[in-house]
């Protein structure tokens, strides 16, 4: 039943859009600053376009940070889940479940804290939960319910989406998250309400935390090609399978979280294992930004001229391929030796050499066709490590999201397929293939093609012409994953 449109109703919708948009934007901006603060204190660096991951942080500090972070969070979550009112999921909040105020605040802060310490899990659930909780209080204050609670559900869902839009400066993705995943109902009213609130939240959040390019895809070809359209179908099919498996895995991990005191040892153990893995694969840490950028930064100079792709010096310096081996100015804030030494030694072992030569750009990881199988190996290692460590973190009892881990898996899988693809079709770039993979695997794992496509395109600020191949891949992956997930 559609609600009746009245001046009074449009008035409170407009008021909710502005008031909640501003409040959620402030919250999203502050949560981002909190993340930066935790990273600075525990890891000695702050993520950004110039440094997408803790590559310049000594291996021992990586391991200690994530172990301590998950240990502290495990204790607090145990007390919260057994001594206070539990915090429901956003979907349950939309359905009417009450979100306790202080418990939700603590729950949200803990999620940001563990991501900042290096835990392999997404941070996007925190601003969504904050938005949903604020929306419930707004509805209580102004007695907003509607017929059978339809207005209240809409406000809570749209506010949760605005949290996503605010924290990532992605208003389209925030709107589609609300109408495609939470409400599963697309109307002009919901789209307008959702887009308005997400846009305001994004604007306010950017005013607090600043605007920074989240994913650097400057090594991508300038235009789409017919062969890239064909790649989109192939990559979409592969990512449909991968996304379905990741969705099943994350659902299994969520369903088997410890319910008692086991969280007190499982979360510290997950932190220790993450830290040990990060000594060799530092890009596994955090919400997935570093792992995803590894795929986006895979640049093969031999085919670049044919594809029309170019990589600037600043982009190459910030490339994980360079940072993994200590090339360039990795970090001014992370003191001590061992920057990237784990992966550098691993690469030297594969080559049978003595590791990177120092500050020469990409010294240990020469990005060329002659080393394509080595590059595939590192991408495959990143893909497997990120998937397993993320599922382990969820299984141990941690709360958080899987959007950014899904993008990371899609980017690395797309880059792997792209490395093989450009041998046959050098007019395409690996970065474009990684972009297609990121959107299509996220779509498959979330069963939300519009949200996934918009989130990846907004985070990367990709040229609008790439909506066509990305859309084709997303459609393919969504259909295949839907079929796989429907099978018993």
PLM features: what roles do these ranges have?
Residues 1-488:
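Alpha-helical transmembrane segments and immediately membrane-proximal extracytoplasmic
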């Amino acid at each position: 039943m559609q609600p009746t449109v009245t001046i009074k109703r449009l008035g409170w919708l407009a008021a909710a859009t502005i008031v909640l948009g501003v409040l959620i934007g402030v919250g999203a901006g502050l949560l981002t600053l909190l993340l930066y603060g935790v990273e600075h204190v525990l890891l000695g660096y702050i993520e950004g376009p110039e440094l997408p991951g803790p590559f310049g942080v000594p291996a021992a500090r990586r391991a200690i940070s994530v172990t301590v972070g998950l240990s502290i969070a495990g204790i607090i979550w145990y007390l919260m889940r057994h001594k206070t009112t539990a915090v429901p999921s956003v979907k349950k909040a939309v359905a009417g479940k009450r979100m306790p105020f202080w418990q939700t605040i603590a729950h949200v802060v803990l999620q940001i804290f563990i991501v900042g310490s290096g835990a392999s899990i997404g941070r996007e659930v925190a601003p969504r939960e904050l938005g949903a909780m604020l929306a419930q209080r707004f509805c209580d204050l102004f007695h907003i319910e509607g017929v059978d609670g339809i207005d209240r559900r809409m406000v809570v869902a749209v506010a949760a989406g605005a949290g996503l839009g605010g924290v990532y400066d992605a208003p389209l993705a925030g709107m589609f998250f609300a109408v495609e995943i939470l409400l599963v109902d697309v109307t002009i009213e919901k789209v307008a309400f959702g887009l308005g609130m997400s846009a305001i939240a994004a604007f306010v959040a950017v005013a607090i935390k600043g605007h920074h390019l989240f994913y650097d895809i400057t090594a991508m070809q300038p235009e789409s090609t017919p062969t890239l359209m064909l790649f989109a179908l192939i990559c979409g099919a592969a990512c449909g399978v991968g996304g379905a498996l990741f969705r099943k895995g994350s659902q299994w991990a969520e369903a088997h979280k410890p319910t008692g005191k086991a969280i007190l040892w499982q979360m510290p153990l997950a932190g220790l294992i993450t830290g040990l893995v990060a000594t060799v694969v530092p890009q596994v840490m955090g919400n997935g930004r570093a792992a995803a950028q590894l795929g986006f930064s895979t640049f093969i100079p031999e085919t670049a001229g044919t594809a029309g792709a170019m990589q600037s010096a600043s982009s190459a310096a910030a490339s994980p391929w360079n940072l993994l081996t200590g090339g360039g100015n990795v970090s001014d804030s992370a003191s001590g030796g061992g920057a990237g030494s784990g992966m550098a030694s691993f690469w030297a072992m594969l080559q049978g050499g003595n590791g990177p030569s120092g500050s020469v750009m990409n010294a240990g990881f020469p990005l060329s066709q002659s080393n394509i199988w080595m590059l595939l190996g590192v991408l495959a290692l990143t893909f497997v490590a990120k998937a397993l460590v993320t599922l382990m973190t969820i299984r141990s009892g941690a709360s958080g999201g899987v959007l950014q881990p899904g993008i990371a898996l899609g980017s690395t899988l797309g880059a792997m397929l792209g490395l093989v693809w450009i041998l046959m079709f050098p007019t395409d770039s690996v970065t474009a293939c990684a972009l297609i993979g990121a959107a299509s695997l996220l779509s498959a794992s979330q069963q939300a093609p519009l949200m996934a496509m918009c989130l990846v395109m907004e985070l990367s600020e990709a040229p609008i012409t790439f909506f066509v191949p990305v859309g084709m891949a997303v459609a393919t992956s969504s259909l295949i994953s839907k079929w796989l997930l429907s099978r018993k």
